[in-house]
């Protein structure tokens, strides 16, 4: 009888070194114990793959909120700040960033919940993230399919965002609503010397929409600044373009917003970043936190990869190299499509705290 080759045996049966004593073991949720969603999400940390990242993101945000819940010390109260929107409010300033497609989707209601109950301190979004919120106050967005023909939809005057459908009439209604407000802003600029910035424009629109289903209605009501460094890159920019022919002269100052955003970061006792999506919103928040030598808490949610060197795909460790996240922080990136995971994360963090604290408030009746 022949013996197995020693080279093969040594290769297959190579002895292992012991792992560190505190290394967690892989373990999933046992449904024999019943259905407890909190325990289910707690089990994600040791499930592996992106379930682990999701579980760690929930932990990171809860640590962020634990810090935010602490009262300011007497010497930390920002009594000299005259801008109510950027005044320090807690021991952790929470920056929320998201892209326009999330507002087009049902995540709008998740984001509105955060603004409604003043659970965040600052928003950074894109032009679409602004206009889509207001447009939904004027007319609905519909479910469609990724496979619908673009040629047929164009002939019917229907725009597709993934598997969502937006009739072009919605943008016509938006034009009817926003043009008089742009006239009003131009008149204030001429008569009162008002210097408009993207955040001030969004605040004015939020005040005028009069609809509590709107994110920016609540941002205006709760004095949450909304920054949009690319305000003209969307339908709102289209309206401003048309307005520049009808009533030329409106000036938008982006530098004052940069100063406000960076000042919020510099003032922060601790800083937390929750960035859903990539592109300009991700870098704008991260770069503001560079001004304080990095954020203390960070969660990124997107599907981008780092192989192409894009900022969207960059892992948190790359941000640490730039000083945008602190060296001793425990940041998390969840590689997932946001509509799948962001409501779950909010449910296990912000919403759980809100409802467990008995802070449920009566909702206002929707009105346009």
Swiss-Prot record:
Pathway: Protein modification; eIF5A hypusination
Cofactor dependency: NAD(+)
GO terms, molecular function: deoxyhypusine synthase activity
Domain of life of the native organism: Eukaryota
Sequence positions that bind NAD(+): 100-104, 126-128, 132, 233, 278, 303-304, 337-338
Active site: 324 (nucleophile)
Annotated EC: 2.5.1.46
Coiled-coil stretches: none
Cellular component annotations (GO), alphabetically ordered: cytoplasm
Segment forming the signal sequence: none
BP terms from Gene Ontology: negative regulation of reactive oxygen species metabolic process; protein modification process; spermidine metabolic process
Alphabetically ordered keywords of this record: Hypusine biosynthesis, NAD, Transferase
Binding-site residues, spermidine: 131-132, 238, 283, 309-311, 318-324
The keyword Transferase belongs to this UniProt entry's keyword annotation: yes
Enzyme class, broadest EC rank: transferase
Family per record: Belongs to the deoxyhypusine synthase family.
Function (record text): Catalyzes the NAD-dependent oxidative cleavage of spermidine and the subsequent transfer of the butylamine moiety of spermidine to the epsilon-amino group of a specific lysine residue of the eIF-5A precursor protein to form the intermediate deoxyhypusine residue.
Protein name, entry field: Probable deoxyhypusine synthase
Organism listed in the record: Drosophila melanogaster
């Amino acid at each position: 009888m022949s013996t197995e080759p020693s080279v093969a045996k040594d290769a297959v049966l190579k002895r292992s070194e012991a792992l560190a004593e505190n290394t967690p073991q892989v373990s999933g949720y046992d449904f024999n114990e019943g259905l407890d969603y909190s325990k289910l999400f707690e089990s994600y940390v040791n499930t592996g793959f992106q379930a682990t990242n999701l579980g760690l993101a929930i932990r990171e945000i809860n640590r962020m909120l634990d810090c935010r819940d602490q009262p300011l010390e007497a010497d930390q109260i920002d009594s000299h700040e005259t801008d109510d929107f950027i005044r320090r409010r807690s021991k952790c300033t929470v920056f929320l960033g998201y892209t326009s497609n999330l507002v087009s989707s049902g995540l709008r209601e998740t984001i509105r919940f955060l603004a409604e109950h003043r659970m965040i301190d600052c928003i950074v979004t894109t032009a679409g993230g602004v206009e889509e919120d207001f447009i939904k106050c004027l007319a609905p967005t519909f479910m469609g399919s990724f496979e619908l023909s673009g040629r047929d939809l164009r002939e019917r005057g229907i725009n597709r965002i993934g598997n969502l459908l937006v009739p072009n009439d919605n943008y016509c209604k938006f034009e009817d609503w926003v043009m008089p407000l742009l006239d009003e802003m131009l008149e204030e600029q001429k008569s009162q010397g008002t210097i408009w910035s993207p955040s001030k424009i969004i605040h004015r629109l939020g005040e005028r929409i009069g609809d509590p289903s709107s994110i920016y209605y609540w941002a205006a009501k709760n004095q949450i600044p909304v920054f949009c460094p690319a305000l003209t890159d969307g339908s709102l920019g289209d309206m401003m373009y048309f307005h520049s022919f009808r009533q030329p002269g409106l000036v938008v100052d982006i530098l004052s917003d940069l100063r406000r955003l960076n000042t919020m970061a510099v003032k922060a006792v601790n800083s937390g970043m929750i960035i859903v999506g990539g592109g300009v919103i991700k870098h704008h928040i991260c770069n503001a936190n560079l001004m304080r030598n990095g954020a203390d808490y960070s969660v990124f949610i997107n599907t981008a990869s780092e192989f192409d060197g894009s900022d969207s795909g960059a892992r948190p460790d790359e941000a640490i190299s730039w000083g945008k996240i602190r060296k001793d922080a425990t940041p998390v990136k969840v590689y997932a499509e946001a509509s799948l995971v962001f409501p779950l994360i909010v449910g296990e963090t912000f919403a759980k705290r809100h409802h467990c604290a008995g802070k449920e408030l009566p909702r206002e009746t929707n009105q346009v």
